[in-house]
Structures are given as C-alpha cells and as structure tokens.
C-alpha cells in the first residue's frame, strides 16, 4: 500500500484525512477515543508525513490513493472525515467512487474555489535553514520571524525529521507542495452532483464556510447539511475535539 496509515479500534470503518501540512499524527487523540466504538484509519496523504513523495499532486490523485487504501483494507463503505484539504479529498472521493463510501464529513472546507492562503507559511518553511539546525528550538527561532503564532509553528514542526548525519529535513514534499499549491484551491467541478450523505462542519470563528456558501453546497451535495461548532476556528479538531466527536457520532 502506497499510503502510510494507522489503525485503531474495531467496528464500522472511519477514514480520517488531515489537511495541508498535516499528518495522521494530528488526529491520534481523536482516533484513540473513537477507536473505542469504530475501526479508525488515519492516513498520511501523498507528499505528507510518512507517505510517498510524488511530483504529481491534486485532489483527483489523492482521492485515487484513498480508493486504493479502501480496496487494500477491504473496507465496507467507510465514512470519510476530512479536514480542510482532506475535506476536498473526501468530496472528490464521493464523486469518483460513491458506491464505496457510506457518508462523508468535511471539516471546515466547502466545495468552492479558495484563494491560496499559504504563501507566508511556504516562504517560512523554505527559508528556514533546517539542514544545519542543531535543535528543534533553532528551527523554531527561525520560523518565528515569519510565523509569530507558537501553536502554528508547533503544528508545522511536527513535519521535522532529524537526519542521521545531523540537522533536519521536512517529512513533507515541500518543493512539490509549493509548486502545485494552486491545485489545492480549485473548486468542485460545476456539474458534479452526489447524493452521498454529507455533513459540512464549520468553526464559528472561521471564514472557510460562510452562510452564503449554502446554495453552492446544496447544489453539489443535495443530501447534506451544515453545522457550526461554536468557539472553533479552522482547526476544529484541535480547538473543540469533544464537540467535533459528538457531531460525528450524531451524523453516524
């Protein structure tokens, strides 16, 4: 299997897909908790975490990787939960192989076009001299010049891998992500309509899914609904994990 993945629990299967610059590690607390009632599979998407690097990067390709994971594990119509970029992968999956999926949950990501918001992060990651860094604190100090938010830096630094000869490297395929970043803003194709039951979960403090997006969402996903988790920003699973799990269980 090309994708790196982790499993926990037993029962009806749920696949969890992380967002841009994320890894399956970001969801392990939730995966462990939900593993008490379900079989949870958290995967590293291509060019992220411990999964393979490729010069090709886009939603159709990532959805194809997910389909191969479903086939490899012989999963019977899993629920797919995707955050941000992972939400778009879940949507694309529901278009490409709807018969293999029971439901999808898109966490703070709609089907519309999104302007690229990550230039600052990419510039910070590319400018950091991690190959010569002596410690994670050294990398943190470098990143802080462009990324003042401590939590954001700690999230990004989960991608650091120490080299045997000293210094660090990024687990993610930073060059390809930077080159193909525009692909991640693309909207769902205008004619795509899927009846897969779908939940769009948004954070009340995030602007990724707006009230005005409801018409577009229902156009592509007529069997869907939008719910808001109060007090959560874009990183819903980090801000309000208990409320997120409750919403997932209610939808199941």
Residue ranges and their predicted role:
Residues 1-15, 35-38, 75-76, 182, ...:
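Alpha/beta-hydrolase fold catalytic core
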Residues 19-22, 84:
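Active-site glycine-rich loops that stabilize anionic/oxyanionic intermediates
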Residues 21-29:
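Serine-hydrolase catalytic-loop signature spanning alpha/beta hydrolases and amidase-signature enzymes
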Residues 28-35, 41-82, 246:
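Active-site loop/oxyanion-hole signature of alpha/beta-hydrolase fold enzymes
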Residues 76-117:
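Conserved hydrolase catalytic core segment
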Residues 116, 131-185:
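Conserved alpha/beta-hydrolase catalytic His-Asp/Glu region
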Residues 165-220, 225-228:
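Conserved serine/cysteine hydrolase catalytic core
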Residues 224-252:
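Catalytic active-site module of serine/aspartate enzymes centered on a nucleophile-bearing elbow/loop
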């Amino acid at each position: 299997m090309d994708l790196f993945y982790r499993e926990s629990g037993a029962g009806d299967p749920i696949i969890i897909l992380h967002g841009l610059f994320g890894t399956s590690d970001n969801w392990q607390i939730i995966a462990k908790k939900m593993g008490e009632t379900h079989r949870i599979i958290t995967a590293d998407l291509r060019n992220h975490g411990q999964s393979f690097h490729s010069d090709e990067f886009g939603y159709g390709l990532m959805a194809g990787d997910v389909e191969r994971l479903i086939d490899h594990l012989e999963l019977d119509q899993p629920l797919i939960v995707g955050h941000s970029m992972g939400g778009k992968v879940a949507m694309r999956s529901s278009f490409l192989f709807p018969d293999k999926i029971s439901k999808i949950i898109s966490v703070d990501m709609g089907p519309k076009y999104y302007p690229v918001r990550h230039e600052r992060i990419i510039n910070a990651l590319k400018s950091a001299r991690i190959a010569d860094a002596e410690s994670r604190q050294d990398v943190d100090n470098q990143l802080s010049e462009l990324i003042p938010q401590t939590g954001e830096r700690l999230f990004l630094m989960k991608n650091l891998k120490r080299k045997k000869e000293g210094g660090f490297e990024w687990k993610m395929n930073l060059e390809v992500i930077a080159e193909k970043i525009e692909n991640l803003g693309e909207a769902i194709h205008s004619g795509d309509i899927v009846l897969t039951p779908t939940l769009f979960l948004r954070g009340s403090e995030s602007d990724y899914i707006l009230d005005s997006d409801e018409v577009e969402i229902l156009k592509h996903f007529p069997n869907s609904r939008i719910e808001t988790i109060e007090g959560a920003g874009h990183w819903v699973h980090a801000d309000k994990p208990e409320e997120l799990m409750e919403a997932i269980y209610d939808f199941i």
